[in-house]
Design a protein with these regions (language model features):
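Auxiliary Fe-S-binding modules of radical SAM enzymes
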Residues: 1-25, 183-266
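Canonical Radical SAM [4Fe-4S] cluster-binding loop centered on the CxxxCxxC motif
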Residues: 4-6, 10, 14-18, 23-57
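Fold-independent oxyanion-binding glycine-rich loops
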Residues: 15, 81, 133
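A secondary-structure boundary/capping signal
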Residues: 32, 79-80
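Short glycine-enriched, charge-decorated loop/helix-capping segments at active-site entrances
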Residues: 47-53, 143-153, 224-230
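Conserved alpha-helical substructure of the radical SAM core
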Residues: 47-77
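Conserved AdoMet/S-adenosylmethionine-binding subsite of the radical SAM
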Residues: 63-75, 84-221
């Protein structure tokens, strides 16, 4: 599945001129692209991901807004949805942003489309990449539940995600791996399993971080999870402390909650 508008346009949900949560310890101009190849039942941007919120916007218009904000941000960050579905137009945008603003570039992805990532990395340097590791890659059935996929599809997806993570680690200076601690879907033990799997990949990146994130039932979350309570702050913190014992010392360990913001464990 790829969504390819004309090379001079992107299908977007909107943007935010200054964001403090998309790149650790930095301020970003954040752009949301529409559509996703996953159907996570807890997604906070579900209408965007499913294409209900979308508009076709010329790349030049986006660049103009970023140019106005460039003195107030460190990064130009693209998220979704799944941005790599529009990888060709995305590369065009990144190149124009770099040329006209000089900002560092950032991407948020589920890493399930390694061929799209390869195309992006072969055309432009992405300084920061955030990868949402939904569930243990060794457990396709659990990954399927968390990502809203059929198990047979997830069996192939987990291998593609692993490939995408490895590819990204070789093509960026700052890799931020994230997992959302979703009630009734993932336990602290599952997060520890994810951490062991990532640690075993022996990723070589100048800067690498793992972030345990709090689930919050925002307005955009589908009904099934909209009525659930947010993950307790203390559980998120304890889980981050637990996985700090798993990763090698070169990996930064963080947790993110509504109450505390971004907190580094080590």
């Amino acid at each position: 599945m790829h969504i390819q508008p004309s090379g001079s346009q992107l299908i977007i949900g909107g943007w935010k001129e200054t964001s403090l949560v998309d790149v650790l310890e930095s301020v970003s101009f954040t752009l949301w692209l529409s559509y996703c190849n996953f159907k996570c039942p807890w997604c906070s941007n579900s209408r965007l991901a499913r294409g209900y919120e979308k508009k076709v916007v010329p790349i030049g218009e986006i660049v103009s807004h970023v140019r106005e904000a460039r003195n107030f941000v460190d990064y130009f960050h693209v998220t979704g949805g799944e941005p790599t579905l529009q990888y060709r137009s995305l590369v065009t945008l990144y190149l124009k942003i770099k040329e006209e603003t000089g900002l560092k570039l950032s991407l948020d992805t589920n890493a399930s489309l390694p061929e799209a990532l390869q195309y992006i990395f072969s055309h432009v340097k992405i300084d920061h990449v955030a990868i949402d590791v939904k569930a243990p890659l060794s457990d396709a059935a659990l990954y399927a539940r968390v990502a809203g996929l059929q198990t047979k599809i997830a069996e192939k997806i987990v291998e593609r995600v692993r490939e995408g993570i490895m590819l990204t680690s070789q093509n960026t200076e700052f890799l931020e791996l994230r997992t959302l601690l979703v009630p009734d879907l993932l336990s602290p033990s599952d997060i520890e399993t994810i951490s062991r799997e990532l640690a075993n990949l022996d990723l070589k990146v100048p800067r690498i971080a793992y972030v345990v994130q709090q689930f919050i039932p925002y307005e955009g979350v589908p009904d099934e999870y909209r009525n659930k309570k947010k993950t307790p702050r203390e559980l998120v913190k304890q889980t981050a402390e637990r996985v700090a014992k798993v990763f090698p010392d070169n990996v930064e360990i963080w947790y993110r909650t509504n109450e505390d913001g971004n907190v580094r464990i080590r």
